[in-house]
């Protein structure tokens, strides 16, 4: 740790022990970024581009230290200087780039791509204020901005810029990059596009802002309120800004490696994470057309490059944009989308297969399915529902495109970082190989009937619950029983996530207790959820849960 010690001296002209937690964090940030850069980056002829409206990457310091293999060394150095890595990390702002499972899956895929040593990168937007920060008053949710970008940040500005055309004006982008460390491997990039004129000061009264001022608001918020037309159009602006930058970057990188663009599928594969990036299909065709490739060939090229991940069977998640929105915002795409629709209707005239329906709504998922080579669900049951019900009409004509990719997690974060006592115990039983190959965790089955091992696991679990108890007390003032059953539901607040059923169960148990029927073991219900600002039923459910807490 001599290099870190020297860096602290050079940055702040004092020893680590005399530095504030903020100063130590800034030094660790710089040191870790240098270590990541020194590792190098995965590259190759063909690259996977994972395009997503959100990346729920979480705090990065400890995760990067673990993947670099220097976590214990850094923690020991800090301890010798009277510092705690946990306290240092509390200073770190969390990137406000994601919201739920869709964004966490994207983050886990990037971790996996880097760890497996595959050439790949993520592409998204650099939201300044995130979704929102949730605050409670009178048992009601209120929203305030969640700024996270500071002068000392994981973001690194690049010299990559593009012009993105809209009706009546163009916007210049700047690409920022965050390094994603592979475990004991090189890194990859998460590339985030931004506008230089983003103005955080235009936000007032919670998260209210002028939704029409695209020159200054485009990258302020993830999922801006879409309860009015201005909000819905802002989302279209965001989505096109994201995919136009992505498409230009991908084509430039392919050409730099020797592609003539007719062979683009040999250089790039694009994973469309839900329907937000769907406009990359017509944008690719537009850009290929500018480079002299005719429409039919361009459509064929794109159909071998793009793949689509479906996350939910909810109709609202299968985005449908009025064609007049696109005419108002990205008119250059409308003739392309109409041609794509005509090609589909010439072969498959059924209304439920159309890209543009009889109400002049553009079905983004339909475009992804017709002009992508793969459609995957994110769990076995989910994929079967897609094939047999929600997207059955597409499965009948494209059975070879449908496949399942069950959601996984980067267990290194959720185990090695979040539960270090359990990590050490598992390593003592089966060795260290599981840290890179999760299949080795199956070796734990040899101990499923070993009472001594089970008792030790229970002790680790109990201690973890005590830590949770202390955290809840410190942050809410509520004291919970670590010996109770922790019934935890952490999901975005939505009717289909069914937090309301859990609330009804709590009411049922409460009434039973009032009648003298106590449960065999105490139960502590823990919820974590945000409701979209204009989703009033979801906000009412939060109100119900917070009111139940006060009984």
Short names for language-model regions:
Residues 1-551:
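A conserved ligand/cofactor-binding region detector
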């Amino acid at each position: 740790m001599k290099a870190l010690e020297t860096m602290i001296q050079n940055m702040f002209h004092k020893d680590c022990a005399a530095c504030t937690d903020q100063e130590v964090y800034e030094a660790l940030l710089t040191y870790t970024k240098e270590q990541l850069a020194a590792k190098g980056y995965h590259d190759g002829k063909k690259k996977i581009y994972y395009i997503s409206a959100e990346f729920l990457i979480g705090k990065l310091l400890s995760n990067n230290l673990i993947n670099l293999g220097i976590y214990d060394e850094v923690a020991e150095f800090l301890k010798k200087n009277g510092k705690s890595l946990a306290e240092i990390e509390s200073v770190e702002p969390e990137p406000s780039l994601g919201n739920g499972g869709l964004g966490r899956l994207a983050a886990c895929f990037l971790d996996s791509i880097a760890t497996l040593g595959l050439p790949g990168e993520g592409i998204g937007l650099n939201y300044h204020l995130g979704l929102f920060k949730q605050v409670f008053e009178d048992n009601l949710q209120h929203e305030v901005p969640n700024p996270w970008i500071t002068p000392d940040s994981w973001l690194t500005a690049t010299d990559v810029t593009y012009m993105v055309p809209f009706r009546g004006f163009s916007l210049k982008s700047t690409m920022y990059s965050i390094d994603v460390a592979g475990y004991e491997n090189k890194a990859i990039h998460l590339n985030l596009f931004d506008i230089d004129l983003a103005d955080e000061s235009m936000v007032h009264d919670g998260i209210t802002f002028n939704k029409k001022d695209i020159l200054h608001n485009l990258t302020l918020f993830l999922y801006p309120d879409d309860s009015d037309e201005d909000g819905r159009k802002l989302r279209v602006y965001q989505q096109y800004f994201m995919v136009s930058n992505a498409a230009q970057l991908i084509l430039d990188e392919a050409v730099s490696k020797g592609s003539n663009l007719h062979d683009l599928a040999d250089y790039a594969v694009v994973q469309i994470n839900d329907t937000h990036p769907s406009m990359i299909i017509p944008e690719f065709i537009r850009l290929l057309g500018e480079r002299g490739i005719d429409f039919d060939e361009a459509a064929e090229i794109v159909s071998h490059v793009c793949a689509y991940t479906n996350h939910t069977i909810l109709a609202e998640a299968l985005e449908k944009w009025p064609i007049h929105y696109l005419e108002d915002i990205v008119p250059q795409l409308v003739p392309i989308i109409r041609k794509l629709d005509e090609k589909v209707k010439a072969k498959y005239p059924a209304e439920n297969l159309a890209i543009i329906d009889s109400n002049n709504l553009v079905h983004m998922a339909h475009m992804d399915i017709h002009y992508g080579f793969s459609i995957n669900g994110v769990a076995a049951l989910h994929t079967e529902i897609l094939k047999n019900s929600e997207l059955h009409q597409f499965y009948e004509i494209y059975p070879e495109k449908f496949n399942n990719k069950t959601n996984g997690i980067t267990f290194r974060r959720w185990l090695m970082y979040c539960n270090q006592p359990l990590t050490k115990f598992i390593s003592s039983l089966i060795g260290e190989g599981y840290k890179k190959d999760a299949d080795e965790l199956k070796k734990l089955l040899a101990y499923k009937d070993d009472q001594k091992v089970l008792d030790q696991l229970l002790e680790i679990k109990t201690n973890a619950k005590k830590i949770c108890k202390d955290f809840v007390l410190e942050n809410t003032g509520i004291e919970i029983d670590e010996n109770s059953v922790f019934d935890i539901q952490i999901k975005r607040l939505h009717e289909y996530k069914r937090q309301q059923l859990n609330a009804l169960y709590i009411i049922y148990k409460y009434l039973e207790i009032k009648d003298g029927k106590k449960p065999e073991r105490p139960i502590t219900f823990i919820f974590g959820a945000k409701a979209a600002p204009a989703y009033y039923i979801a906000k009412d459910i939060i109100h119900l849960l917070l009111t139940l807490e006060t009984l």
